[in-house]
Amino acid sequence: MKHAPPLGFEQVPPGGMCVCAYLFVTRRDQLLLGKYADDPQWEALAGLEPERRRTHGWGWTVPATHLKLGEDPREAARRIGEEILRIPGLRYSDPRSEVDFYPSKMAPGEKHYDIWFFVDGAPPKDYELQVPPWYTELSWQDPRTLPAPTYARGHEDVVARWLATKSNVVGSGTKAAAR
């Protein structure tokens, strides 16, 4: 298939589908990125099974989660901020959606579809970075200069798309205008 799916999915596409929220926490033009620890809590926190966290723990990733069935992307972003990153007082933008599809690794000849919800987050000015035990590292990085090969899970593509479409966070509950 070389085109997007027809309107109105009635079942998951044969090549698979992911619906994810990404939380882009920024401070002074730097983005908070993490490296996964091989911690079983990832399954409950973000739907990240052992094979994926072991395979991708070497590189930088944007804090993210698969949405739970029926979960609002805004709630998923808050779950990332509060449960995964543990940042109190984080301010969130409204989500922006992006779609991607590419050859499926699990089903040769089929396409895998991704629906991404991008949410920007601004921590309180007095926030000091603390690394939860399910990360080996959390760090402020400049997404414009970080080399693509240092990202894991294809997150260099996610960050590139975010940079092309990002908005400014102006406060909790305030709709941010996308460019």
Residue ranges, per PLM feature:
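Active-site segment of metal-dependent pyrophosphate-handling enzymes
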Residues: 86-126
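NUDIX/MutT-family hydrolases
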Residues: 58, 116-118, 127-162
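Conserved Nudix-box catalytic region and its N-terminal flanking loop in Nudix hydrolases
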Residues: 27-87
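A generic structural micro-feature
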Residues: 15, 54, 107-113, 135
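Charged phosphate-binding loop/patch that engages nucleotide di/tri-phosphates or the phosphate backbone
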Residues: 154-179
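Acidic, metal-coordinating catalytic segment for phosphate/diphosphate chemistry
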Residues: 1-24, 28, 36-41
